[in-house]
Regions:
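Intrinsically disordered, low-complexity and often Lys/Arg-enriched segments
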Residues: 1, 239-246
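Core catalytic lobe of class I
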Residues: 3-203, 208-211, 246
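Short, conserved SAM-binding/catalytic segment
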Residues: 5-7, 214-227
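Conserved SAM/SAH-binding loop
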Residues: 15-19, 230-239
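Generic detector of low-complexity/intrinsically disordered segments
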Residues: 26, 67, 228-229, 241
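Short, basic, helix/turn surface patches
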Residues: 129-137, 227-236
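Asp-based, Mg2+/Mn2+-dependent phosphohydrolase catalytic module
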Residues: 202-203, 222-227, 243-245
Length: 246
């Protein structure tokens, strides 16, 4: 049974997204940064192991992607999901398995060069896949598929996979309505949604990151309203079933 915390127009759940998502009402957009390489083995060099493990991982990706799509409004919605070149095969397999093709693949230029390995090129980019649902379309027809959002080695909130707020601002700005993040982490997507005046639903299964997300989103709510100088007091309960599935 998931713990639920309501902060203004944001509702946060501490639990497994595969259990929580079926209980949620419809949203307009899913914006998320799922774990890369889940349910795979490693060869000890930071690389995912052989093809069979990648394909097995696709079953888990397909499961949450299917639930995420089911949460979208039937007529119009989208999903932005972060990935990298190693997890690209897994995402592509999962997308094919659920018949939801990737609409666009955005290259995120980090404007920073990572440490990399001892033999290959040093990484300076990641990827963001855009999935369209219903009659969704990017309004700005001049928007290119390479975008620059600066990031460095410092993680302001401590999360090892933390994304810059500018990246999530971009995804929110080019998405409709209410936003769901089934892998909320430290709450960056939620902060971006709240700053844009959007309703937000987030799910996170790690207590540490959930608590940080609650704090960050509470601060964002306060900063976003001149009429409310104090952060909204969170309310919480242990019943996610109180939110009816649409």
């Amino acid at each position: 049974m998931a713990e639920r915390v309501v902060i203004g127009n944001a509702t946060l759940y501490l639990g497994d997204c595969l259990e929580v998502m079926p209980t949620l009402a419809k949203v307009d957009a899913v914006i998320t940064d799922p774990p890369y390489g889940i349910n795979t083995k490693s060869d000890g060099l930071g690389k995912l192991s052989p093809w069979g493990d990648l394909i097995n991982s696709a079953h888990w990706y397909a499961a949450w992607m299917r639930e995420a799509r089911a949460r979208l409004q039937p007529t119009r919605g989208c999903m932005w999901t972060c990935l990298n070149w190693r997890s690209m095969v897994t995402f592509q397999k999962a997308a094919c398995d659920i018949a939801w093709p990737i609409e666009s693949l955005m290259v995120w230029d980090k404007e920073w060069i990572g440490p990399g390995g001892l033999r290959g090129l040093r990484p300076s980019y990641e990827l963001v896949a855009l999935f369209a649902h219903g009659d969704f379309g990017i309004a700005d027809r001049g928007l290119p598929d390479v975008q620059r959002f600066k990031v460095g080695s410092h993680k302001p909130n401590g999360h090892p996979a933390e994304k810059p707020i500018s990246l999530m601002d971009f995804c929110v700005r080019h998405s409709p309505g209410a936003v769901l993040d089934p892998f909320m982490g430290s709450g960056t997507t939620g902060v971006a949604a709240v700053r844009a005046g959007r309703s937000f639903v987030g799910v996170e299964m790690d207590q540490r990151w959930f608590d940080i997300a609650c704090e960050r989103i509470s601060r964002a709510q306060a900063q976003g309203s001149l009429l409310q100088p104090e952060a909204p007091a969170p309310t919480q309960d242990g019943l996610f079933a109180s939110v009816e599935a649409a």
